[in-house]
Amino acid sequence: MEDEAHEFFHTSDFAVDDLLVDFSNDDDEENDVVADSTTTTTITDSSNFSAADLPSFHGDVQDGTSFSGDLCIPSDDLADELEWLSNIVDESLSPEDVHKLELISGFKSRPDPKSDTGSPENPNSSSPIFTTDVSVPAKARSKRSRAAACNWASRGLLKETFYDSPFTGETILSSQQHLSPPTSPPLLMAPLGKKQAVDGGHRRKKDVSSPESGGAEERRCLHCATDKTPQWRTGPMGPKTLCNACGVRYKSGRLVPEYRPAASPTFVLAKHSNSHRKVMELRRQKEMSRAHHEFIHHHHGTDTAMIFDVSSDGDDYLIHHNVGPDFRQLI
């Protein structure tokens, strides 16, 4: 150190004033350093004082709330106002508008806490907005009882017994109950019983409508004596006494003895016909024949009476009428 100062004094030419000036500068620098240190001490003391005045916060707070230095937490009143405002906005929007907003933004709206209080959702699972499950409306199934599987062999046997039997409905019903197998359900007998009741009603109606004079006789037309007709009609002897063909002609005033249906058992080709024109020709021929027979009979009766008359007029008749050989020329 001393060697360096000695070299400095011998190698450098400097004045005393310069040395003094340099010392003054050093003093200023020292004063600046002292001032800076004083200022630093003052700032440190003030910071320590402000830190001492403020209450110290620890990690565990008595009220159980922890705050972060980077997050600004609003007060409770401000949070209530924000929630109230969001509720008003949600209520003012209709479900259609909410759905449109969801489609535009691509995010679902806030779920209703009342409807989703059951099971918590998994935050990791993401559900798509557009669901592919489309429910198709279907017709509700009826609650009517389904018919059980029927035994066709037993049913055919019962039907053959029903159609081949000439007895009444009650007898058929009892015979079918006897022939029905014990394992068959009662549902199989219900339709047959209904059919038997209907057939029995038709048979009773037919028995009532049959004429009382002949219990075993079948109904026949009183004009053509046929027993096969699709419908019985009213005639001169009362309702349901003529067949369909004869009843139609009777209603129109054209029923004559010469008319007979072709299927009538009393049909004679020389006397009857089912054509109106042919019937009129037969009637005309019949009337002409009857008139001719009446004329011949009347003329023959008159001649016989005049010949065998014993009165005085008999001679005049013989004179004026040339009956027998004329003998006057011989006299």
Swiss-Prot record:
InterPro entries: GATA_TF (IPR051140), TF_GATA_pln (IPR016679), Znf_GATA (IPR000679), Znf_NHR/GATA (IPR013088). GO terms for cellular component: nucleus. Expressed in the vascular cylinder of roots. Expressed in the differentiation zone of the root stele. Keywords: Activator, Cell wall biogenesis/degradation, Developmental protein, DNA-binding, Metal-binding, Nucleus, Transcription, Transcription regulation, Zinc, Zinc-finger. Residues 34-47 have a biased composition (Low complexity). The keyword Cytoplasm does not apply. It is found in: Nucleus. Coiled coil: none annotated. It holds the Pfam family GATA. Residues 30-49, 105-138, 174-218 are annotated as: Disordered. It comes from the Eukaryota. Its main location: nucleus. A zinc finger (GATA-type) spans 215-269. A motif (Nuclear localization signal) lies at residues 139-146. Residues 116-134 have a biased composition (Polar residues). The keyword Zinc-finger applies. One of its GO terms (molecular function) is zinc ion binding. SUPFAM superfamilies: Glucocorticoid receptor-like (DNA-binding domain). GO terms for biological process: cell wall organization; circadian rhythm; positive regulation of DNA-templated transcription; response to light stimulus; tracheary element differentiation. PANTHER family: GATA TRANSCRIPTION FACTOR (PTHR45658), PROTEIN GAT2 (PTHR45658:SF18). Transcriptional activator that specifically binds 5'-GATA-3' or 5'-GAT-3' motifs within gene promoters. May be involved in the regulation of some light-responsive genes. Transcription activator involved in xylem formation. Functions upstream of NAC030/VND7, a master switch of xylem vessel differentiation. Belongs to the type IV zinc-finger family. Class A subfamily. Overexpression of GATA12 induces the formation of ectopic xylem vessel-like elements. This is GATA transcription factor 12. It comes from Arabidopsis thaliana. The gene is GATA12.
